[in-house]
Amino acid sequence: MSNNQDRPGQITDESLRERLSPEAYAVTRRAGTEPPFSGRYYDHHETGIYHCICCDAPLFSSEHKFDSGSGWPSYWQPVSGDALSVVRDTSHGMIREEVRCARCDAHLGHVFPDGPPPTGLRYCINSLSLDFKAAHK
């Protein structure tokens, strides 16, 4: 899955169903949520960049990752200001801010106003929506 070379406009639902696990497809295309403490990146400490599992867009840097205690990978900011889109989510009887990949519209997770300085934000992201690429040493 880490060698995705699809470009915007070329990613089809069929190609994602073939390439992604059923769980990753449910999270990214159906706005699902993985169980807390189950994802491969919630306790991950390597240096590098977390990319979108669907389109390979860079999303988050390990430099901005922190342990929120939530059971999901958490970041206080994205890798760039245009990496994400945020939309209002009123599902499950709550009002939240849903985080999506700006390139391919994959569901990533949610952002909350309870993170650390300097932003005060907590991007709570499903591991299943991410693909980590280690920094070159």
Curated annotation (Swiss-Prot):
Name recorded for this polypeptide = Peptide methionine sulfoxide reductase MsrB
InterPro entries, A to Z = Met_Sox_Rdtase_MsrB (IPR028427), Met_Sox_Rdtase_MsrB_dom (IPR002579), Mss4-like_sf (IPR011057)
GO biological process annotations for this chain's record?
Answer: protein repair; response to oxidative stress
Q: Where is the active site?
A: 124 (nucleophile)
Reaction catalysed by this chain?
Answer: L-methionyl-[protein] + [thioredoxin]-disulfide + H2O = L-methionyl-(R)-S-oxide-[protein] + [thioredoxin]-dithiol
Q: What's the Enzyme Commission number for this chain?
A: 1.8.4.12
Please report the organism this UniProt entry assigns to the protein: Thioalkalivibrio sulfidiphilus (strain HL-EbGR7)
Q: What sequence ranges are listed for the domain MsrB?
A: 13-135
Lineage, highest ranks first: Bacteria, Pseudomonadati, Pseudomonadota, Gammaproteobacteria, Chromatiales
The note on cofactor binding and number reads: Binds 1 zinc ion per subunit. The zinc ion is important for the structural integrity of the protein.
Stated family:
Belongs to the MsrB Met sulfoxide reductase family.
A GO cellular component entry from the record: cytoplasm
Its cofactor is: Zn(2+)
Q: Does the keyword RNA-binding apply?
A: no
Answer whether the UniProt record assigns the keyword Disulfide bond to this protein.
no
For this UniProt record, the keywords arranged alphabetically read as follows: Metal-binding, Oxidoreductase, Zinc
Gene for this chain = msrB
